[in-house]
Amino acid sequence: MPAVVRGGPPKPRRPRAEAPASPSKGKPAPRKAQPAAKLHAARGVGLSPTVALSVAGAALGLGLVVMLATGHRAERLGASMVRGVDNTFASAGFRLKTVHIRGASATAQADILKASGLYLDQPTLGMDLADVRDRVQGVGWVKDAKVVRMLPDTVLIAVEERPALAVWQNHGRMKVIDSEGQVITEADPARFPQLPLVVGQGADQAAGLILPAVASRPRLRDRLEAMVRVDERRWDLRLKDGSLIQLPAIDEESALIQLDQLDQRQRILDMGFARIDLRDPEMVAVRPRDAVLPGQPAADGA
């Protein structure tokens, strides 16, 4: 017969309560997975999962199609697929709305924007930034350029501008140049009457060395009409009153210091000499203007 257990049938055992984990020893509870609501792009623009998966699928399809195709067919198919991806992103807000140009003067900005080839609502992800940079660097104002895409709708063009140094006249043609003698083709010389005028073959390359020295001498600078390059070796300075100052081919700075000293002592720039010859470091030669007697007509060129 079955054994009899006193006290009736056994009661089910209650599970022991687990002791609370110590803050210092327990493992942190795993975080709950966040719902994939949006995949955020730069500057706070979101892509829905549907759009993101569509783009990923298009990119994968592009790779497979191009792998199966060869030659011009692959190029055409690849370009078509890229346009499709661009259009997908563009529909999500990746279209060009703003172009920021930094480091350029107001005069140069219009030329830079035109050369860039950028246009409103252009797909921003598909644009070739290297190509944009090459076009911008083709502008005469631009010494160097950097192009940055700022998603979703902005492009930044940062440039190092060539500062206009002088107007160069050669063979009857006038051009604006920078300190390296580089012609700024987009600059209209008529819009820069404040720039000094340099004349002659080689004047464009040599102007960057002599003009700062002249600019640092206000009395000479304010009287200067033009600087003429002679035999691509030296300078003649033509003043507004018709005077001519001849500089040596070597050590122009010493000759200008000598002119400073004469002007401080004798105000030689106010004396109206026809010529001041500084080519000989040991001697300054001057030639007065031809005197005209009362009632006598002046000779041509006097």
Curated annotation (Swiss-Prot):
Any one Gene Ontology cellular component term annotated for this protein: cell division site
Compositionally biased intervals (Low complexity): 18-38
Positions of the UniProt region annotated as Disordered: 1-41
Tagged with keyword Cell membrane: yes
Membrane topology: Single-pass type II membrane protein
Spans within the Cytoplasmic topological domain: 1-50
Periplasmic side: 72-302
S-S bonds: none
Gene Ontology biological process: cell septum assembly; FtsZ-dependent cytokinesis
Family: Belongs to the FtsQ/DivIB family. FtsQ subfamily.
Function (record text): Essential cell division protein.
Full protein name: Cell division protein FtsQ
Organism whose genome encodes this protein: Caulobacter vibrioides (strain NA1000 / CB15N)
Upper taxonomic lineage: Bacteria, Pseudomonadati, Pseudomonadota, Alphaproteobacteria, Caulobacterales
